[in-house]
A protein has these predicted regions:
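Glycine- and other small-residue-rich loops at beta-strand/loop junctions that grip anionic moieties
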Residues: 50, 76, 169-170, 195-196, ...
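RNA substrate-binding interface of SAM-dependent RNA methyltransferases
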Residues: 89, 104, 115-118, 124-129, ...
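Amphipathic alpha-helical repeat scaffolds
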Residues: 80, 172-179, 292-297
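Active-site/ligand-binding-proximal alpha/beta "capping" segment
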Residues: 240-289, 293
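Structured adenosyl-cofactor binding patch, chiefly the S-adenosyl-L-methionine
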Residues: 145, 183-187, 196-214, 271-310
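N-terminal positively charged helical leader segments and presequences
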Residues: 32, 40-138
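Intrinsic disorder/low-complexity segments
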Residues: 1-46
């Protein structure tokens, strides 16, 4: 029964199987939709509509593109259907979801919004022009969420007997860090540890490049010295990558408890890691370039470890 002051909102779905949502990167299976109208009760009415570029919420969303306002508020932005869906799947407590139907790319957005509302997020409908103002993507899909930041410590990690870890030091570019997280997820890494970061792990482009994997891979930010001591305590070998290493990455033993350590784009690993690693390895280079993109080098080394372990 609908109580006084409540509003019934109905969405009509026309699929009897998993819906498909295209988002520029291929099709993805998503929520189960049934061929009838699903009605839900909105306790305090329909989502607030915002069309003014001067609205305080719009101004705050624009500010959250920068690190200081994000850290002060303890939140960050999650843009995109796929990224928001993965956040919900991992039970991230989204605080707010902003949507603009004029930008929608598929048919499943209403179900995603309903899932977010059910999970406790506050919904706001934006005009097309207003959403273009707050979106940071060149081609937005009409969905933007505000999520709480979190901090996980080394002691919070639950690891198997022979974990595969990825340690990255002083990564500078958000796109590289996001790609590294995505690759670590694909390789089945048990955790990613970011040492002495230059870029913010909650940068919108980290979220974007990771395709939302930021929410599924255990992620710790810590100082290099503490990470090295923690690895030693747990008898996890640290294998550092450097072009000067005498051993090819394919010739090294990458089985057992292992942490692969990657350095920054410009300078590679610091002397601290090169001196304190249990072993160093290199990827052979045949051309004029003296190094690979750090994300590509990470992928190559990680999947060699995966190959050896299977």
């Amino acid at each position: 029964m609908v109580g006084e002051g409540q509003v019934v909102e109905c969405f009509l779905f026309g699929h009897g199987t998993h819906g498909i949502h295209g988002n520029g990167g291929g099709e993805e299976k998503d929520f189960v939709f049934w061929p009838f109208s699903v009605c839900s009760v909105w306790p305090v009415g329909l989502p607030e509509k915002i069309s003014s570029l001067q609205n305080p919420r719009v101004k705050q969303l624009v500010k959250l593109r920068d690190r200081r306002p994000r850290d002060e508020a303890g939140v960050f932005l999650v843009e995109g259907y796929r990224e928001i869906r993965r956040a919900l799947e991992k039970q991230v407590a989204l605080q707010e979801v902003y949507f603009a139907p004029d930008w929608f790319l598929g048919e499943n957005e209403p179900a995603l919004l309903e899932a977010a509302r059910t999970a406790g997020a506050q919904l706001f409908e934006l005009s097309k022009e207003t959403f273009a103002k707050v979106a940071y993507r060149e081609r937005p899909d009409g969905l933007l969420a505000v999520a709480p930041q979190w901090k996980q410590a080394l002691g919070d990690l639950t690891l198997p007997a022979a974990p595969l870890l990825l340690v990255v030091e002083a990564i500078e570019k958000p796109g590289n860090l996001g790609t590294i997280l995505r690759s670590a997820d694909a390789a089945g890494c048990d955790a990613v540890i970011v040492c002495d970061p230059v870029t913010d792990i909650f940068n919108p482009n980290v979220v974007r490049a990771s395709t939302g994997v930021l929410f599924s891979v255990p992620l710790v930010v810590e100082e290099s010295a503490r990470v090295r001591a923690w690895l030693q305590e747990r008898k996890i070998r640290a294998v550092a990558t450097t072009p000067a290493a005498p051993t090819l990455y394919t010739a090294a033993d990458l089985r057992g408890p292992l942490a692969i350590v990657m350095g920054s784009e410009q300078y590679g690993l610091s002397d601290f890691w090169l001196k304190n690693a249990d072993a160093t390895v290199r990827i052979p280079m045949a051309g004029q370039a003296d190094s690979l993109n750090v994300a590509m080098a990470t992928i190559i080394t990680l999947f060699e470890a995966v190959r050896q372990r299977h």
